Amino acid sequence: MKFTFSWLRRYLDTDVSLDVIIKKLSDIGIEVNNVDYCEHLKTFVIAEVLEVNPHHSANKLKICKVSDGKQILQVVCGASNVKVGMKSVLACVGSIMPTDQSIIEVVKLRGVESYGMLCSNDELGIVDHRNSKNGIIELPNTYNVGDTFFPCDPIIEVSITPNRGDCLGVYGIARDLAAAGLGKLKCIGELSNHSNCSSPIEVSVQVDGIVKGRYIKGIKNCESPKWLKDYLLVCGINSISFVVDITNYIMLSFNRPLHVYDANKIKNKLIFKKADNQTEFYALNDKKYILGTENIVAVDLENSIHSVAGVIGSKLSSCLLDTEDIFLESAWFAPVDIVLSSKKIKLSTDSSYRFERFVDPRFLQTGLDLATKMILEYCGGTHFDVVSNEVHVVDNIELNFFPDSVRSIGNVNISNEEIFDFLIKLGFIVDNNNEFLWRVTVPSWRSDIKHSSDIVEEVLRLYGYDKICEEPIPISHVDISDDYHDRLKALLLSEGLMEVITWSFTNMVFAEKLGYSSELLLIDNPISDKLNLMRPSLLLNLLQVVYENQAYGSSEIAIFEIGQVYGFNNICGSNSNVVCGVRYGNNLPRNLYKCDRSVDVFDVKSDVISILQELNIESNSIELRKSDKSYLHPVRSADVYFKDICLGYFGELHPNIVHLYEIKRPVVCFEVFLYKIPKVDVAHKELTESCYQSVKRDFAFLIDKDTSVQHLIDVTKNSNPVLIDNVTVFDLYEGNSIGDNKLSVALSVTFNPVDHTLNDQEIKDASDLIINAVAEKLGGVLRSF
């Protein structure tokens, strides 16, 4: 948005310099993009064409003699509308063109030198919706030859955020500056004489909106004064006539879009409604648009379309210099309706840009009166009563506000009196009878103020962000779970797994195939049909990752993820974190030594044991039980228990599930439920190496097949816990030679004495304790063949 310094001072009574205003605008949150002191615009002057002669070697070019008030220059021009006696804009040699930043130089055009360029609207960046024809600018005779065309008044360009539609008018910016202490906001003049004449044109609204209108009869439309043309020119808008220019001026000054119709083209009534599909509309810019039900149109009783409401007017009822009777419209429409309407016809105008960002619904009458007053002053005429129709109801927004919240949230030292003064200057109505709790009514032009925290922000930006006191950030304690996560990630990375992060959603079909219930986990509005369920397990998404990487040619995949699951066993809450891993393919890439092999259940068993040890749970304190999970292999899987608490599982994926995911080779996986891990205190003791020789003995026991090998290890170790240091399995055998329901388990037992070297008898006694314990508790016997 652009405006000049003098334009701002029309509404802001101040004597501060431009530099002070620029700094304050940035301080209060209005970004200043550029300040143009207009030195380069002085080279664009009013020139008169004295002669027009044909070019000797180019039919479309003409050799012109033009006067810039100081000298007569030769200019070669290709415009079809150039003629003797016309006044236009001359870009002198050295001028920088506003649109492409090109520099005007002395050039030869087909052998003839040209000392400047006569300019068109497009070349100067001037928008003229009503004149889309090519040609140089033709100025009225009231312009003086030699005067500068552009106003040499400093131009301020600002960026207005979408929430501050009120600052899309110069008056809104002046209001903020006045509230910040840079002067006093001037009062807006009012229409002094009101009419008692009934309007011959009525309005009817059939959409979400408010429309007010006024009929003015017998005007003498005229050319706009230079000050008005200059203001519009700064914003890139070409002057049309005084009546049209005034509507643009009110819009740019007060963020109040207006539209003016030739009243004689309207049949009795304007009806604002949705357009029919495939309706043709001829706009002011001489273009045809095909309308749809997204567009709001103003039609009369003959169903003639006079405007696409909030966007652009119709060529049918455009206001021209010879127009005598006009109808002024001031309206409010729902921002979303104008967004859709503008997108439908792919046209954005100054008017639609403002409607989309909210305009003040309570300023309709005032904007109408301001335009009426200026039209009567410059063009004469008789005005009639305002007609209106309202479908939208404007409600006041009232908020409870604690003034102390400014001090506590903003960490500033500000008094209640200062807070009150800021709010009043911004247009808020404040009931401060209660010292601690105020009742604040939000002004109608501030649609962005919805909560008391927004009021705090308003006070702070005017008081000054630089006055917020610095305060050190409090040191917060690190969540122990975060520390665990980092440690586990480092551990698994060292084990050769790569971390992945997947969606918190998964595919309901696959979840049900794995046996998870979807009753409580369905998403009402999923981002995809394949992501319609909150994940009950990380395994589901990791298998999808395996499938996708397999499709890209990966033959070895080892991945893990730490994250939350939902609804698992119906006990998961906000801390339902788990760690899940998947291995696929070979344990190592192909190599010279051929030491690679396919991953198996023991790889993921090792992963689980490493994780539990990292969490202070030793391997000798866990118990492996047969898993009943349908998606795991029935004999190559196990659940992991600690003190009768299931901490997770590991195993090979069931072939049916592998086939379901279209994976080509067996997959092994694990999942550890971190939210179930108990806090285990570890007594750190000094590691002392025994100075006495340890003794190893091997035992091969015959036990029933349904007896847990882990149970055998525990019985062996507990038979003499002081002397036995370690028990490991080194062989398993089953076959007809030992019986159908029997299993041979070979154990290696390490005896580690602490105070003397064991003799043969002590070793025999310790061995007998093991054999007797296994026989008594498990019915196992020492294998003798």
From Swiss-Prot:
Every copy of the FDX-ACB domain together lies at 690-783
Pfam families noted in UniProt: B3_4, B5, FDX-ACB, tRNA_bind, tRNA_synthFbeta
Task: Quote the cofactor binding remark.
Answer: Binds 2 magnesium ions per tetramer.
According to its UniProt entry, the protein's GO biological process terms are:
phenylalanyl-tRNA aminoacylation
Per the record, the major location class is cytoplasm
* Membrane-spanning intervals of the chain: none
**Compartments in which it is found:** Cytoplasm
What are the protein's UniProt keywords? Aminoacyl-tRNA synthetase, ATP-binding, Cytoplasm, Ligase, Magnesium, Metal-binding, Nucleotide-binding, Protein biosynthesis, RNA-binding, tRNA-binding
Question: Per the database record, which ranges form the tRNA-binding domain?
Answer: 38-150
The catalytic activity of this protein is classed by the Enzyme Commission as 6.1.1.20
Q: Which SMART domains match?
A: B3_4 (SM00873), B5 (SM00874), FDX-ACB (SM00896)
Domain B5: start-end pairs: 394-470
Catalyzed reaction equations:
tRNA(Phe) + L-phenylalanine + ATP = L-phenylalanyl-tRNA(Phe) + AMP + diphosphate + H(+)
Q: Report a single Gene Ontology molecular function.
A: magnesium ion binding
Residues at which Mg(2+) binds: D448, D454, E457, E458
InterPro entries of this UniProt entry?
aa-tRNA-synth_II/BPL/LPL (IPR045864), B3/B4_tRNA-bd (IPR005146), DNA-bd_dom_put_sf (IPR009061), Fdx_antiC-bd (IPR005121), Fdx_antiC-bd_sf (IPR036690), NA-bd_OB-fold (IPR012340), Phe-tRNA-ligase_IIc_bsu (IPR045060), Phe-tRNA-ligase_IIc_bsu_bact (IPR004532)
GO cellular component terms listed in the entry, alphabetical order: phenylalanine-tRNA ligase complex
Needed cofactors: Mg(2+)
Self-association state and partner proteins as the record states: Tetramer of two alpha and two beta subunits.
Q: Which HAMAP family match?
A: Phe_tRNA_synth_beta1
Which NCBIfam families does the entry link to? pheT_bact, YtpR
Give the record's family classification: Belongs to the phenylalanyl-tRNA synthetase beta subunit family. Type 1 subfamily.
Q: What is this protein called?
A: Phenylalanine--tRNA ligase beta subunit
Task: Provide the species name.
Answer: Ehrlichia canis (strain Jake)
